[in-house]
């Protein structure tokens, strides 16, 4: 089975994902739980994670130059902290090099370089930065992590994660 999103691209993964979530839902029901309760159990056991994407649009030729300059600046001056958490690893997929907090540089084993930067923080967070290949924008993918002490603590964990995301955005100047 497969689906097309109307642009000629065939998407098989979404159909597979629907089948898997249906199987998980059936398992949860057989065990007297809802999908939501199962998700809360996962958060309590493994931690809470929140992802947020920021698209910074820079139209025109000057915008393309700004985006290029932003990438060059992040590459030359990687952040030391993001949202109050120390950056412990920086990855540059264009140069295929990664640098740890002590300044040790090692190679990234990938067949093809890509204009992507990633920063990993001490508290388990991650920020990926890349220019769009089709639009005049630079994209920031922010992931923050935290603990969730109980099934009923979701609202608190989510609010704390949102605060972390805002702090990371401030650190990045976006």
Predicted regions and their residues:
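A conserved active-site cap/scaffold subdomain adjacent to cofactor or substrate pockets
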Residues: 13-20, 34
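Short glycine/serine- and small hydrophobic-enriched flexible loop segments
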Residues: 19-27
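Catalytic-core signal marking the mid-to-C-terminal active-site face
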Residues: 31-174
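Single conserved hydrophobic/aromatic residue that forms the stacking wall/gate
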Residues: 1-11
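Active-site loop ensemble at the mouth of alpha/beta enzyme cores that anchors a bound cofactor
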Residues: 9-15, 74
